[in-house]
């Protein structure tokens, strides 16, 4: 096996793992919504979209042949993670400053107008407020956990690209 094949396979395995983790996080959010009754706010839904796009781009990238195709989808994964950072960062800031709201009246119609809100309303339709504090998980709010996941993705995926492109082929 050549070095090119080895590093490309390792990168593809990483993308598949990332996609599975993102889908698991969406599943966890749905569990908390349905089983625990924690209603999602507009920023929660935007974070779900970011996770979904990361998973989709990661799976497509893992299925691509050749370095260039994989790199394009890794760039899309990184872009989706940056969008997730914006949504989760704003949500974490709102939770830290409850006097400010995410503006459910402003964001709700926009988020509810997105295609998945009509196709899968249970998972992608707004039903809560961004200022609602839910019990922390291991000391962090859900928004802080999401922010951590998005930041790690935005750092690790480009690091993987850079590391594997420096290898001699």
From Swiss-Prot:
Residues 32-49, 90-144 are periplasmic. HAMAP family: DsbB. SUPFAM superfamilies: DsbB-like. It comes from the Bacteria. One of its GO terms (biological process) is protein folding. The keyword Secreted does not apply. Required for disulfide bond formation in some periplasmic proteins. Acts by oxidizing the DsbA protein. InterPro entries: DiS_bond_form_DsbB/BdbC, Disulphide_bond_form_DsbB, DsbB, DsbB-like_sf. One of its GO terms (molecular function) is electron transfer activity. It is a multi-pass membrane protein. It holds the Pfam family DsbB. PANTHER family: DISULFIDE BOND FORMATION PROTEIN B. Belongs to the DsbB family. It comes from Pseudomonas syringae pv. tomato (strain ATCC BAA-871 / DC3000). This is Disulfide bond formation protein B. The chain crosses the membrane at residues 15-31, 50-64, 72-89, 145-163. Residues 1-14, 65-71, 164-169 are cytoplasmic. It is found in: Cell inner membrane. The keyword Phosphoprotein does not apply. GO terms for cellular component: plasma membrane. Keywords: Cell inner membrane, Cell membrane, Chaperone, Disulfide bond, Electron transport, Membrane, Oxidoreductase, Redox-active center, Transmembrane, Transmembrane helix, Transport. Disulfide bonds join 41-44, 102-130. The gene is dsbB.
